[in-house]
């Protein structure tokens, strides 16, 4: 799984959007720090970056009428089986949140979606 370029979030089909939510939940919880080739860069940033990215996913879900468990809106929450952060420090974020989400990464994501038979407008 990958984190989709944030410019694509509003265009993601339902399965990819909901899958991204599940991926963010896993990474925020016990998956934090577990190596995976396509998301290793996430662990070079503060967990606050992942929370902020996940917020974008959850906001898109809400705009489409999906209900998100409210506990995930708490920056300190890490899932039912993972201890919460005491007080995860907020940080000033860039745009995009992850500097790795550049033009080349955008094209990789579009190509990945195309390989799945998904053409974006």
What are the language-model segments listed below?
Residues 1-121:
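Expand to "…catalyze enediolate/carbanion chemistry for C-C bond making/breaking, isomerization
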């Amino acid at each position: 799984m990958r984190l989709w370029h944030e410019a694509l979030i509003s265009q993601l089909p339902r399965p990819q959007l909901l899958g991204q939510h599940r991926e963010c939940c896993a990474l925020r919880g016990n998956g934090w720090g577990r190596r995976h080739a396509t998301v290793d860069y996430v662990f070079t940033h503060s967990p606050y970056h992942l929370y902020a990215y996940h917020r974008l996913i959850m906001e898109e879900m809400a705009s489409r009428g999906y209900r998100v468990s409210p506990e995930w809106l708490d920056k300190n929450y890490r899932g039912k089986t993972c201890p919460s952060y005491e007080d995860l420090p907020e940080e000033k974020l860039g745009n995009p949140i992850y500097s790795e989400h550049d033009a080349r990464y955008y094209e990789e994501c579009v190509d990945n979606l195309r390989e799945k038979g998904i053409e974006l407008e």
